A protein has these predicted regions:
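Glycan-recognition and catalytic cores of secretory/periplasmic carbohydrate-active enzymes
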Residues: 5, 21-24, 33-347
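N-terminal secretory signal peptides and thylakoid transit peptides that target proteins
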Residues: 1-17
Length: 347
């Protein structure tokens, strides 16, 4: 076990933040989010992803503190920004609007965002995050303004949810009945995965761009998640967690960091997947056959819970996961799975 493991080390080792720059500090601050700026006053839209338990002395550079010079990285940044400007938000919003009875004459998206696909809506969350990150990196006003328009449109959809028969705060591109199916075990793709992507994108819009409406929307979503999951027994919730749920524990821990409300840590802990966490807590390798990339956001969430002051067990789970994967499930090219599934131990 690596006693110095922190969130930045863990993320880099699992390949999810290899490009993030870190800087040593002499203060007592914890590791901050891989996507954010240095923390300032809460509510200003900057990264306040601080933890109470890490004791680490590293944090990432604020994105705006680094300017890329001409070269391949700058070229890629320009391409990325151009793509973000190109994406038609009304096409992505089509299924959100029609889901709650709002008019839309936009052409629906295809692929995994098609109107008949159960994962629809997740790309909108990715776009929210991408716009926020790109604006924080470049200062480009068009990216900031596009993110604000998208947040405002999602807020309108959320406000229309009760009239459509959905719970207050519900926001998605598919009906709430998907969660009825999830809880009943009758088969559905991955509804909490999509909810996580939307919530994470809204958090980034608030934290990196300062869009206050984004925090309002994501807190209403979080209240909906709380009310929905509070009704389930422990056994029922564990069955729910057998279906991919992204990093729900991670984003809820972020809400605690932003608001100071311990309620969000309580809700985050409901997304502790015992079948995965319990063996790791005992340093047992039960990863073979699991959907590999599904486990990484769970572990990031475990670290965030520990950073925000919850049990040391969460750090132990994440440390053991990191050590087991890097020592026994990693190929020479850096991959940790075959066909997205963890394989038997490689060493």
């Amino acid at each position: 076990m690596n006693p110095s493991l922190g969130r930045r080390h863990f993320l880099a080792a699992t390949g999810t933040a290899a490009a993030a720059a870190t800087v040593a500090t002499g203060g007592a601050g914890a590791a901050h989010a891989a996507t954010g700026a240095a923390p300032t006053t809460a509510g200003t839209g900057t990264d306040t992803d601080t933890g109470t338990g890490t004791g680490t002395g590293t944090r990432p550079f604020p994105l705006g503190a680094v300017t890329l010079l001409d070269g391949p990285f700058r070229d890629n940044q320009r391409r990325n920004s151009a793509y973000l400007r190109f994406v038609d938000i009304d096409r992505l919003l089509h299924t959100f609007r029609t889901n709650v009875g709002l008019p839309s004459d936009a052409e629906p998206c295809g692929g995994w965002e098609g109107p008949g696909v159960e994962l629809r809506g997740h790309s909108t969350g990715h776009l929210l995050s991408g716009l926020a990150l790109a604006h924080a990196s470049t200062g480009e006003e068009a990216l900031r303004d596009k993110g604000r328009r998208l947040v405002a449109a999602l807020a309108e959809c959320q406000s229309a949810a009760p009239a459509a028969g959905f719970g207050t705060g519900y926001l998605s591109a598919f009906p709430e009945s998907f969660f009825d199916r999830l809880e009943a075990g009758s088969g559905v793709w991955a509804p909490y995965y999509t909810i996580h992507k939307i919530m994470a994108g809204l958090v980034e819009q608030y934290r990196l761009v300062g869009v206050g409406q984004a925090l309002e929307v994501v807190l209403r979503q979080a209240r909906w998640v709380d009310e929905r999951t509070a009704k389930l027994s422990y056994e029922q919730m564990q069955r729910v967690l057998e279906t991919e749920f992204g990093g729900m524990n991670d984003v809820l821990a972020d809400l605690h960091a932003l608001t100071g409300d311990p309620r969000w840590l309580d809700v985050a802990e409901r997304f502790t997947h015992a079948r995965v966490f319990d063996p790791l807590a005992g340093n047992q390798d039960k990863l073979a056959g699991l959907h590999a990339n599904t486990q990484i956001p769970k572990m990031v969430g475990a670290l965030r819970l520990w950073e925000e002051g919850r049990a040391d067990r969460y750090r132990t789970v994440a440390e053991n996961f990191w050590q087991i994967v890097t020592d026994h499930h990693t190929y020479v090219i850096g991959a940790t799975a075959t066909a997205r599934r963890s394989t038997n131990r490689t060493s």
